[in-house]
């Protein structure tokens, strides 16, 4: 293996997140952009499936992923699938989130985790990080990173989980 291939493989491996599927999603209390507290596990119980996408305003692939998901969201919502976008922006960056979400016309729920509690409890280091959680609060799918077209893989996985 050439030196460059080895370095690429090492960087890819180190950038991966090791979040086991079938693990219970931690009981997190996050905030809406208006400052209201939301208990995620209660949100999961209201939907057949919930897509939880972790992102930040400074992360270009994150914004591309959320834009791509926006185009599929109406169909998902009809099938009982909710999308929750959780920003990990720190307190200084948080004032950029709401204007960005409004500008991009993201109609799904946007929450903030300024203390990065999710990263610690779910053991991931890279964003975007996407989880699919069932109504029992179990992680049934996890994906790290974004390449154009990943949203179609996610759509296919959601349909499979719904038995479609």
PLM regions: where:
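Structural microenvironment flanking redox-active thiols in thiol-disulfide oxidoreductases
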Residues: 63-104, 115-120
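Short pre-active-site segment immediately N-terminal to redox-active cysteine/selenocysteine motifs
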Residues: 47-50, 54-58, 126
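N-terminal targeting signals for export/organelle localization
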Residues: 1-31, 141-143, 152-153, 164
């Amino acid at each position: 293996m050439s030196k460059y291939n080895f370095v690429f493989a090492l960087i890819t491996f180190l950038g991966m997140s090791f979040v086991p599927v079938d693990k219970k999603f931690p009981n997190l209390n996050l905030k809406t952009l208006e400052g209201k507290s939301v208990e995620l596990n209660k949100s999961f119980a209201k939907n057949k499936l919930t897509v939880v996408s972790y992102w930040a305003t400074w992360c270009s692939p994150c914004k591309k992923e959320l834009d791509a998901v926006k185009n599929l969201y109406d169909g998902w919502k009809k099938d009982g699938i909710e999308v929750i976008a959780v920003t990990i922006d720190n307190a200084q960056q948080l004032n950029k989130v709401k204007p960005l979400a409004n500008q991009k016309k993201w109609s799904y729920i946007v929450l903030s985790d300024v203390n990065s509690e999710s990263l610690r409890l779910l053991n991931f280091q890279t964003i975007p990080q996407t989880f699919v959680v069932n109504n029992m609060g179990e992680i049934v799918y996890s994906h790290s990173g974004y390449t154009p077209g990943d949203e179609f893989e996610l759509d296919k996985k959601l349909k499979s989980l719904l038995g479609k």
